[in-house]
């Protein structure tokens, strides 16, 4: 039998994940603990890498035990996904280095997505160009299963699509980027200016352990 919980809430910084979600997760006494946070820190005006490393180390150190496997992952290069990706590229790659270093120190499994070109394919992302769509989640789930060594999982998730992503003409791409900025970036920026928490009003989808039917596992 498999019991599953998902405490994730969009838009939280890593320190907020540590203070608002981590203790609840540990009270569930998981034997498999998946943790990821940090990209929202990368998108902030300032980025406290020392604080991020400390939070990550604390989470890894407290979660890792002989009875609990901890798994995390790195981020893909954002420059091909998001109009502002190049601005945050160096931050994201440095963050990936921190993930690798702290994971090695605490014996945490890492799915290193930075080294897999398929994860940079824009067709795996939702319209906000930040979060994965259904296809993206399917690829990530298959990758994590492979990294965990689950029976029947293989590396086929990393195979590229048979065709290249559609390329828009310059004018069409500009129009698409402007529309993206209007629908997603401007509201995000507005919340930041008003100092409204980006995760305000959002809750976890599965905050308690729930049995997963065999056909869904």
Regions found by a protein language model. Name each.
Residues 1-57, 171-215:
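Conserved SGNH/GDSL esterase-like catalytic core that processes O-acyl groups on lipids
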Residues 6, 35-36, 71-73, 95, ...:
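Ligand-binding pocket scaffold of soluble enzyme catalytic domains
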Residues 17, 47-54, 86-94, 128-136:
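Alpha-helix N-cap and loop-to-helix initiation/capping positions
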Residues 39-50, 77-94, 217:
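Serine-dependent acyl-ester chemistry module
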Residues 51-65, 90, 94-101:
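Alpha-helical scaffolding segments of alpha/beta enzyme cores, especially the outer helices
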Residues 61-71, 108:
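A short helix->loop->beta-strand "cap" motif at the edges of active sites that frequently abuts
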Residues 80-113, 134-138:
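Substrate-gating cap/lid alpha-helix
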Residues 101, 105, 128-131, 135-217:
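Conserved catalytic region of serine esterases and O-acyltransferases that act on ester linkages
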């Amino acid at each position: 039998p498999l019991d599953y919980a998902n405490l994730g809430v969009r838009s939280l910084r890593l320190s907020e994940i540590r203070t608002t979600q981590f203790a609840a997760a540990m009270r569930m006494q998981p034997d498999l603990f998946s943790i990821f946070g940090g990209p929202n820190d990368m998108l902030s005006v300032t980025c406290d890498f020392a604080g991020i490393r400390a939070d990550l180390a604390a989470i890894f150190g407290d979660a890792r035990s002989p009875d609990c496997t901890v798994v995390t992952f790195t981020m893909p290069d954002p420059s091909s996904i998001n109009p502002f990706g190049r601005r945050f590229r160096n931050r994201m790659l440095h963050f990936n280095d921190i993930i690798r270093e702290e994971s090695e120190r605490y014996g945490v499994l890492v799915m290193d997505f930075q080294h897999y070109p398929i994860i940079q394919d824009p067709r795996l992302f939702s319209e906000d160009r930040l979060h994965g769509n259904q296809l993206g989640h399917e690829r990530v789930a298959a990758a994590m299963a492979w990294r965990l060594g689950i029976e029947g999982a293989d590396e086929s998730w990393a195979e590229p699509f048979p065709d290249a992503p559609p390329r828009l003409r310059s004018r069409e791409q500009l129009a698409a980027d402007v529309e993206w900025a209007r629908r997603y970036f401007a509201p995000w920026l507005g919340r930041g200016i008003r100092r409204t928490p980006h995760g305000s009003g959002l809750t976890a989808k599965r905050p308690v352990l729930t049995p997963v039917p065999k056909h869904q596992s």
